[in-house]
Amino acid sequence: MLPPDDRQGFGDLFKHTKSITYQVLRPFTPIAIDSYTFTPIPLLHSKPTFGYFIQTPSENIAYLTDCAGLPQESLEFLQQKSIDICYIDAGAFVDSNGKKDSSNHLSHYEAAEIIKALAPKQARLIHISHTILESLRDIPLPFPYVL
């Protein structure tokens, strides 16, 4: 699978500069919007990508999509938090020979390892394509997480 032809990175956003108010985000530096706090968390992907630790009045959420893993600093940051629910990328499929179809996304096995390390109260696997879901129907999942 080839990545999109986007040499600039988010090039389409630069065409419509008046439609969005841009704010530079820095790793682990929270921003507040009303009663919500968003902390950018660096993720491993084909280009620099952030996940987010989101604090709401009622729960703490880890939102980790478009990732092939977490840098150690990100993992350690999140392990210090009480996470109510973790949404995590599981877009790569692992075939019966153990071959992963994407180097830019986690498999459900890799996502499970991160979930175990973070110990959230709940977890949801996200960023899954219909082809992966079809294949997963025949594979008993070794963990109690929701797809």
Language-model segments: what does each one mean?
Residues 69-147:
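Cap/insert and terminal regions of metallo-dependent hydrolase folds
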Residues 1-64, 68-76, 81, 130-147:
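Binuclear metal-dependent hydrolase catalytic cores
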